[in-house]
Amino acid sequence: FLGMPFIGWLAKRGLTPDQGTMVNQIWVNYIRDIAKDTIKFIEEVYYPDLMAMAPFYKDWFKIGGGLSNQNLLCYGDFPRYANDLSEKSLLMPNGAIIDGKLDEIHPVDLKDPNQIKEFVDHSWYQYPQPDAGLHPWDGITDPKFELGAGTEGTKTDIKWLGAESRYSWIKAPRWNGHAMETGPLARMVLAYAKKMPEQTELVNEALSKAGVPIQAMFSTLGRTLARCLEARMMAREMLRCVDELEANIKAGDEVAANMEKWEPSTWPLECKGVGPAEAPRGALGHWCVIKDGVIANWQAVVPSTWNASPRDPKGQLGAYEAALLGTPVAVANQPLEILRTIHSFDPCLACATHVLSTEGQELCKVQVR
């Protein structure tokens, strides 16, 4: 229920109308039943439950927005036409929104060395030029567990982090110098801004039922709602894909993948490329550099790298950090509100949240998983 199907178990089987271990009519019918069951659960349980609870938590439509009403990033995915990544083909859009300007969508080019750069000023890594940002093709992952200025305590018992401290094993990726949020909310808002019909209809329906404006999407509950709406859309898309798969097989089209560049011996000795995807948690990119026929560098910038990133040289906060600013906590030693906002990102990591008093005394420590 994260917004998209995982098809590895299917794709590796191959396509053929014959019986045996390959995908045949029996398997197609089985997959269709899974798609229908998924739609049934989402439409009869997941979505109604969320919409039933939303009126009791309307204040969470105003909390936890962070970067969501400012900077959003999507790589685009799910082309409906084979090998066509144009805007008319993509179900999930490509683009970036900066400073909350929904009427100004910027194209995202993952091969442009100036668009995406990672910084390590507040991370436990080192670069030859400490303040410089590196495009993933030039990326360096060289650990250096150094606490930095302003830190009180030891490496095994940190008491206080200063503004100049290093505090994360995550780098700080930035798009054209901006901290970005990525994920279902970014995709749904970008699609809404582009007036893509399926997403626009889903968002308008949900907002109407909840009795809130579009601005409510930029929040903790809006982030949770976006994931549910995307699940509705992708479950329907999964059923459509099954029907298309069956039609292709019946028409004699048994091609399962573009094999044009599958054989490594056909590649240049030196080349570089990038493999992007819109994963459940957001924009995912793997950048690869090949020299002398072998991999010389491989860098992955995953959705949680964007969302959980630490500060950058400009002091810009990552999406998690920005979303927690201004969050009211009713009981200091039971900070459920912090958990609620971080969980809305669906984090793929475990982290500790320390709640401190204004005097610097630790009130509690909560593991976020």
Predicted regions and their residues:
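Active-site bordering "gate/hinge" segments
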Residues: 1-281, 292, 302-369
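Short beta-strand elements
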Residues: 284-300
